[in-house]
Amino acid sequence: MIKYLGVVSLVALSLSATADEGPLGSVLMKQTNGCMEGPIEQFGRYIGDWTITDQRLQQDGVTWSPGNGARWNFTCVGDGIAVQDFWMPNGPDGGPPPGVGTNLRIYDPATKRWEVTWTATNAPGMTHIRAEQNDKGDILMHWVTPEQNPPRRITFFAPTADGWDWTMEMSFDGGENWTEVYKIKAAPRK
């Protein structure tokens, strides 16, 4: 028993020494290989630093108006444990940003879908979202809690060499039909 405890202690000491060797970022956020393979790659392919141009549908239901844009940074957590992103919108007319937000995206192999937690400056707690990749390679996200009224969903379209697109839709008839209300175009930051 004493010999066993000695071996366990040595292993624990060597593990803690390894984790303590570098800055926290290099231990948790620098390795991306685990986010670029298997199902984690579904969101891993968005890892990078993106410049966002956005548009909102106006009340008339026809006219689109440009937004203030944003910066959106996706990173790999723990070499494949999760994908985390940081949403940093631009302020109006070059002013200070209104706040920031973050998603933590974790793949559940048992259900073959993503469990996503979103929170932001001035948000009332957290939002739980579920996501699943469709046959076209797009990722469709639905709110779980808090319940949204009207219902909404988000689609991440498969990325290309030039970036990727994203849309938010709302349903005004209980989910029968969906209307795009917000669109994003992401391009690599230069």
Enumerate the language-model features and the residues they cover:
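Bacterial N-terminal signal peptides
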Residues: 6-14
